[in-house]
Each structure stands twice: as C-alpha cells, then as structure tokens.
C-alpha cells in the first residue's frame, strides 16, 4: 500500500511476513520434527512414527544423523518464525517535498538497532539508480544515491519487478524528487 499527494509520498514495505516465508517455516518445522522423531524412535527402540519401524533404522549412525538434522532444522525453523513474528524488513519510505526531507524506516532484529531510521535532506540526493543484472537469476534493484552516504536500496532484491515496473517506479520517484536517473 502506498500513499501519495502533491508534496508527500509514503511507500510502505511488507517485510518478512510473506506467504512464502510462512510456507517455508511450516514445511521446515514439520520436516525437522519428523527427522527428530525418527532419530529418537531409533534410540528408544519404540515406534514414535508408525511409518518407519524402529528396527529398520539403527541408532548409530543413521539415528544420530537424523537427530542432528532434526535439531538443526528446528533451529532454522525457529529463526524463520522469529523473523516473521518480528516482521524484520518492514517499514516505510517517506519523501516530503514540503520539508525537503527523506525518511527511511525499517524494523530490524530485537536489540539496540531494532528501529532503523535514516533521514536525509532532499538536496543531498544525487540520483535514483537502477541496477540490472540479467541471467538465470535476473535482479533489478532501485537505489537512491546520497551525497557522502553511498547508495541506499529502495526495493528488496527478492521483489522481482519487471523492467517496465522498475522503470516506471524510478521515473515517478525521480520526477517527484527532481533528480536524474542512472542505469547500471
């Protein structure tokens, strides 16, 4: 969702609460739980999962390896669930022509830098830059070039915008900010 008037442009970013992240976290949790249950049932000698009789999988080395994979998968799954819960990467970009200020806000991981807030004067913006990498994993990213600060990404690398969409977005933003567009 975006909001735009003659003097203010606010663009909201979704962050890590995407359907694909929910699916991956859920699949990884179920798979790693299955591995851990099979490894545990081979150690106990009892069938905790009816699909695999415990006699078919001996504890050393298969049961140990499956238990290790299960524990590692649970850690990775919990990491994904935490990023979804904290909504890491969400925030907004606010461009205010009236006050001549650009504000960029993102949520990060808990701790000292949980809230990432950047402010710039519009006169410090050199250009809007489009970086295009073609190939099997094509990537198109929109950057804002700031004098003395470098380039700040405005779109996510996994957003996969079409060439027309990224050009349209860059043109509208460059027109709004009254800066040139660079393509790399």
Swiss-Prot record:
- The residue ranges crossing the membrane are 19-39, 57-77
Could you confirm whether the keyword tRNA-binding appears in this record?
no
Tell me where it mainly resides. plastid
- Where is this protein found? Plastid, Chloroplast thylakoid membrane
Q: Name one GO biological process term.
A: photosynthesis
Ordered alphabetically, the record's keywords are:
Chloroplast, Membrane, Photosynthesis, Plastid, Thylakoid, Transmembrane, Transmembrane helix
Recorded GO CC terms: chloroplast thylakoid membrane; photosystem I
Q: Which domain of life is it from?
A: Eukaryota
For whether the record's keyword set contains Transmembrane, the answer is: yes
Output the InterPro entries linked to this UniProt entry. Answer: PSI_Ycf4_assembly (IPR003359)
Under Pfam families, the record lists:
Ycf4
Q: How does it sit in the membrane?
A: Multi-pass membrane protein
What family does the Swiss-Prot or TrEMBL record give for this protein?
Belongs to the Ycf4 family.
Task: Please describe what this protein does.
Answer: Seems to be required for the assembly of the photosystem I complex.
Q: Which protein is depicted?
A: Photosystem I assembly protein Ycf4
Organism, as annotated: Cucumis sativus
Q: Gene name, please? A: ycf4
């Amino acid at each position: 969702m975006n909001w735009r008037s003659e003097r203010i442009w606010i663009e909201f970013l979704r962050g890590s609460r995407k359907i694909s992240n929910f699916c991956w976290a859920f699949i990884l949790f179920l798979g790693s739980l299955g591995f851990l249950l099979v490894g545990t049932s081979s150690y106990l000698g009892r069938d905790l999962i009816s699909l695999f009789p415990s006699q078919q999988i001996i504890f050393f080395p298969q049961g140990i390896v499956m238990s290790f994979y299960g524990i590692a998968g649970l850690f990775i799954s919990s990491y994904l669930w935490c990023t979804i819960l904290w909504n890491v990467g969400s925030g907004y970009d606010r461009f205010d022509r009236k006050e001549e200020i650009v504000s960029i806000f993102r949520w990060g991981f808990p701790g000292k830098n949980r809230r990432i807030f950047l402010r710039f004067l519009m006169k410090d913006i050199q250009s809007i830059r489009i970086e295009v990498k073609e190939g099997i994993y094509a990537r198109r990213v929109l950057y804002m070039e700031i004098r003395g600060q470098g380039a700040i990404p405005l779109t996510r690398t996994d957003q996969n915008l079409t060439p027309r969409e990224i050009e349209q977005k860059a043109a509208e933003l460059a027109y709004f900010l009254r800066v040139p567009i660079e393509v790399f």
